[in-house]
Amino acid sequence: MTAPVWLASPPEVHSALLSAGPGPGSLQAAAAGWSALSAEYAAVAQELSVVVAAVGAGVWQGPSAELFVAAYVPYVAWLVQASADSAAAAGEHEAAAAGYVCALAEMPTLPELAANHLTHAVLVATNFFGINTIPIALNEADYVRMWVQAATVMSAYEAVVGAALVATPHTGPAPVIVKPGANEASNAVAAATITPFPWHEIVQFLEETFAAYDQYLSALLSELPAVAWVWFQLFVDILGFNIIGFIITLASNAQLLTEFAINASYVAVGLLYAIAGVIDIVVEWVIGNLFGVVPLLGGPLLGALAAAVVPGVAGLAGVAGLAALPAVGAAAGAPAALVGSVAPVSGGVVSPQARLVSAVEPAPASTSVSVLASDRGAGALGFVGTAGKESVGQPAGLTVLADEFGDGAPVPMLPGSWGPDLVGVAGDGGLVSV
């Protein structure tokens, strides 16, 4: 890189360039723009910091909140750094503008240089017998001073602008918030799966269709002027109530009208066939792409739904006390008695409002529960007002689901179909109603 030699040019060049330049207005406008950008960056960073802090404090919970915070914390830091860089850039633009103003103030002006040249010309013109030798020397020395001053001012201005240019920070690119390449694979597969629109197939089908019906279309177009004239004559005959003329015109042109009608019907059929064929091609293309793309889009969606639903179902099972259901035995034994014995109640009758037997004795210790809780109900076991029979199958099995109140059910659960009118009098192993 070569640096300009300011001393090699006369001061008129430097003074003219500085005076005729755009001035410091553009630099000051750029500095104001950088200052506004710095303030905007700072405001956005502050607002986003509040949001990220709220999310991190627990407004959201789960992996999504963690990913949000992890993605936006670097972006907030970049906003803060960008605000500082913009403020620094504004300051450097102000420094460059100030350097320009100082250089313009220190630079010898064009009127001063012109006055020096005019004085030198007058002194030289009136230098009779060398009387102006000393003034001419002083004038030339003053011009040399302005020459050196102009070169010095330009060197200082170059140093100030170069330092401002070097000190101006360059803001790096913003960090990526959305994970790059997250959907590239699925998009590539979907793009490879989607077939292009069948323009060529449609054009080929239409060409074949028009070729098949071309003779009818040509005949229809050739007959159209004559048929139009015939219809005009018939219309005039109708308006003039010329029945005889109408019949004569219609009879003399019957063959033409018949051929025109036949050709028109063929063309209409061909047009409908072409429209139906194009619709069929487009529908087949749409359905084929749907069957190819929907599984690609539905797979990740169903996987996400399953991942979200399965933990929820497991949590509900834990709340309901079904986290550890006992396994059903491989083979069920003989049905065990639902109630071992029922002691008679005083008076022999229980109030109709009683819902359960008043006193129940547990089954003998030697009887084991061989049937565990099933997913099927007891079913219809009888009606109110009927007596139980030994030949009828009795309810078998106890509900032994464990919960925080105990390890098993101390009292057997009666079927829900038994109404509140049951009494507590035992009769041959059955329940008797009143």
UniProtKB/Swiss-Prot annotation:
Exhibits vaccine potential. Immunogenicity is demonstrated in BALB/c mice. Immunization with this protein induces a significant number of CD8+ T cells and a strong Th1-type response, with high gamma interferon (IFN-gamma) and low interleukin-4 responses, and activation of the bactericidal activity of macrophages. Identified T-cell epitopes may contribute to immunity against tuberculosis if included in a vaccine. It holds the Pfam family PPE-PPW. Transmembrane segments: none annotated. One of its GO terms (biological process) is response to host immune response. Was identified as a high-confidence drug target. Belongs to the mycobacterial PPE family. This is Uncharacterized PPE family protein PPE46. It comes from Mycobacterium tuberculosis (strain ATCC 25618 / H37Rv). The lineage of its organism: Bacteria, Bacillati, Actinomycetota, Actinomycetes, Mycobacteriales. The gene is PPE46.
